[in-house]
Swiss-Prot record:
Propeptide: 23-46
Region span, Disordered: 25-44
Protein's organism: Phyllomedusa sauvagei
Role summary: Antimicrobial peptide with high activity against Gram-positive bacteria, moderate activity against Gram-negative bacteria, and moderate activity against fungi. Acts by causing bacterial membrane disruption inducing leakage of the intracellular content followed by cell death. It adopts an alpha-helical amphipathic structure in membrane environments. Also shows highly potent antiparasitic activity against Leishmania species. Shows moderate hemolytic activity on human erythrocytes (LC(50)=25 uM). Is also active on human monocytes (IC(50)=22.5 uM).
UniProt record similarity statement: Belongs to the frog skin active peptide (FSAP) family. Phylloseptin subfamily.
Listed name of the protein: Phylloseptin-S2
Primary site of residence: secreted
Compositional bias of kind Acidic residues: 30-41
GO (cellular component) term, any one: membrane
Taxonomic placement: Eukaryota, Metazoa, Chordata, Craniata, Vertebrata
Signal peptide bounds: 1-22
The keyword Nuclease appears for this protein: no
Keywords: Amidation, Amphibian defense peptide, Antibiotic, Antimicrobial, Cleavage on pair of basic residues, Cytolysis, Fungicide, Hemolysis, Immunity, Innate immunity, Membrane, Secreted, Signal, Target cell membrane, Target membrane
């Protein structure tokens, strides 16, 4: 009976450890995805802020050569 209890506790302990590791990896993956989304949004904002400068540069070139 004691052997069975020890075996059961060992199985439960190992199950909890593996579950904890999986949850930690899942949390890290979600954080990486969130960080990547934020990076993409900031790059998009930087690009969108350059559009007026590009348009004015093209317009001034068109006036100069046209």
């Amino acid at each position: 009976m004691a052997f069975l209890k020890k075996s059961l506790f060992l199985v439960l302990f190992l199950g909890l450890v593996s579950l904890s590791i999986c949850e930690e990896e899942k949390r890290e993956t979600e954080e990486e995805e969130h960080d990547q989304e934020e990076d993409d949004k900031s790059e998009e904002k930087r690009f969108l802020s350059l559009i007026p400068h590009i348009v004015s540069g093209v317009a001034s070139l068109a006036k100069h050569f046209g």
